[in-house]
């Protein structure tokens, strides 16, 4: 009897995995991953502080047409470019991250504490906006997102900050050549 009835994967996924298994063996995959170790990678992008606030519904509000929720707990993660830098640093020894933080409530301590030791971060601070924070409110039992609030300024940075960022890139590129920029 086939285990197709018990598989958690779709037919397309099972077919892909079968073809992948025929083409690559474990040792070649391990060698290719180990070959990434000496790459120098520069990551440029938006770091995001991801907050998940778990709650449970209590019922309908008597004063408004909304559902009232009881707060239970929260988790905070380094997301966006912060997460990418951490993932890449698990494969490559040298990773540099360039990103913007907000001047007010920068969350710099949290971000720095949650980057892997081999991630060298260069933060630029924008005066006109916060560090990007995404607060998601999630039903504790079903894990369904109820709503999300984003703290973000998605307008262009001002000319002075742009000049600082460009000057920084012009100063590091010749001195520390990167194999890849993400």
Which positions does each model-derived feature cover?
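Ribokinase/PfkB-type carbohydrate-kinase core domain
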Residues: 1-63, 72-182
């Amino acid at each position: 009897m086939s285990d197709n009835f018990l598989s958690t994967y779709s037919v397309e996924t099972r077919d892909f995995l079968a073809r992948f298994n025929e083409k690559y063996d474990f040792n070649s995959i391990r060698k290719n991953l180990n070959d990434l170790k000496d790459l120098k990678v520069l990551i440029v992008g938006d770091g995001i502080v991801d907050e998940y606030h778990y709650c449970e519904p209590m019922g309908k509000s008597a004063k408004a047409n909304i559902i009232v929720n009881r707060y239970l707990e929260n988790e905070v993660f380094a997301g966006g470019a912060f997460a990418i830098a951490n993932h890449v640093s698990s494969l490559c020894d040298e990773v540099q991250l360039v990103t913007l933080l907000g001047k007010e409530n920068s969350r710099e301590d949290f971000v720095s504490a949650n980057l892997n030791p081999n991630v060298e971060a260069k933060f630029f601070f924008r005066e006109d906006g916060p560090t990007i924070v995404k607060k998601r409110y999630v039903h504790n039992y079903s894990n369904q997102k109820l709503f999300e609030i984003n703290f973000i300024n998605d307008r262009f940075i001002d000319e002075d900050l742009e000049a600082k960022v460009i000057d920084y890139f012009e100063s590091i590129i010749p001195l520390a050549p990167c194999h890849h920029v993400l």
